[in-house]
A protein has these predicted regions:
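Accessory interaction regions appended to the cores of large information-processing enzymes
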Residues: 1-361
Length: 361
């Protein structure tokens, strides 16, 4: 069964007593099996529970403590994942040289059509599909160039995400010998983008050209993988990078006389009311609105207080929305988001500089 719920709120948990760590890991595994809407990510440094919302996470944590792990835990504040994307074609063909200076890679990035991205996320276009069928769909429905459609190498991250790596070269020697290295770097970059190591979404990387050393010993993975990572990052940076944030669709049943409170609540949280309809046979209105997930914490209590407890909201994940601000502009909300995420992840507080990722001929 496919659930139309996306895990868009996450919290990091740990055992209060380090000796209880095995019980925590075991409890997390049991919980993820019991609740198909929960996603658990175990890393060396932290254990993350991803749920569909604030209330869902509260229930998960209660179940973890009382039923699955039966231990005391510590938890972080809830965090919303963002996606990194690009909004234009790279302003230049980016070139990076390998550490030994014997190999050069030329790459550009550009955005994928949003409808195509949704098809991938909904499983209508999969990496496991026949390549000829996928190519035909890209050509017919999305008006792709035939050469590009037939030379789609791989999806990412995790071989299945909504980003593509395409071979746009013409008659290049030894290209197939470095394909695994190029793909490995692509998987890594689409999992951790340049801005704040968030997943990429809707980015197509096109390999324009490669210049490789004749001797295979000089073009192994140790030379190609770090070079490919640099050039992919450079092409993301030159293609107007932006964040995408998750957005809830909120359905609210409310009497007409407290609508001012509904509008006030959404306007204070960057939300947008887009529909109001009378519910037949009742004095209620059915209101539909979009609300950024990052603004949803405490939303229900806030709405109830502004409407004297008369508005009843239900929220579900709707879509990813572009935050159309430059993350490199220190006055922007996007810059603020970048700094928050980088601080949380223990990354440098300075933003990356293009000259560190690109080489001159």
């Amino acid at each position: 069964m496919k659930y139309s719920v996306s895990p868009v709120v996450r919290v990091a948990v740990n055992a209060k007593n380090p000796a209880d760590l095995p019980k925590l890991v075991s409890g997390l595994i049991k919980m993820s099996k019991a609740d198909p809407l929960v996603q658990v990510i175990n890393t060396e440094t932290e254990h993350i529970i991803c749920g569909s919302g604030e209330l869902h996470l509260e229930i998960c944590l209660k179940d973890l403590v009382e039923d699955y792990a039966k231990i005391e835990i510590t938890k972080s504040d809830p965090v919303v994942p963002y996606k990194e994307t690009v909004t234009s074609k790279s302003s230049q063909i980016c070139m990076a040289k390998s550490p030994n200076k014997h190999n050069r890679l030329y790459v550009i990035a550009e955005p994928l059509n949003e409808e195509l991205v949704k098809e991938i996320e909904e499983g209508n276009i999969k990496a496991s599909d026949d390549t000829k069928i996928t190519a035909r769909k890209l050509i017919d429905k999305y008006e792709w160039d035939q050469h590009d459609a037939k030379k789609l190498w791989v999806f990412g991250p995790d071989q299945m995400g909504p980003n593509f790596l395409i071979d746009q070269t013409k008659a290049v020697q030894y290209l197939n010998e470095i394909r695994d290295s190029m793909e490995s770097a692509f998987q890594s970059v689409t999992k951790e983008g340049i801005l704040a190591e968030e997943n990429l979404r809707g980015v197509r990387f096109g390999i324009q050209d490669v210049e490789l050393h004749n001797d295979s010993i000089h073009r192994g993975g140790g030379q190609i993988i770090p070079t490919a990572r640099r050039v992919y990052y450079a092409s993301e940076m030159t293609a107007t990078p932006r964040y995408q944030e998750p957005v809830y669709l909120c359905n609210i049943a409310t009497p007409q006389d407290v609508m001012n409170g509904v509008y006030q609540c959404f306007s204070q949280r960057r939300g947008v009311v887009f529909s109001e309809e009378s519910v037949q046979g009742t004095p209620l209105l059915e209101v539909k609105a979009y609300l950024p997930v990052s603004e949803s914490f405490g939303f229900t209590a806030h709405l109830r207080s502004l409407t004297s407890g008369q508005a009843f909201p239900q929220s579900s994940f709707s879509h990813w929305d572009i935050i159309n601000q430059d993350p490199f502009d220190v006055k922007s909300k996007a810059y603020e988001i970048t700094m928050e995420i980088r601080k949380r992840k223990g990354l440098k507080q300075e933003l990356p500089v293009l000259s560190d990722y690109i080489d001159k001929a």
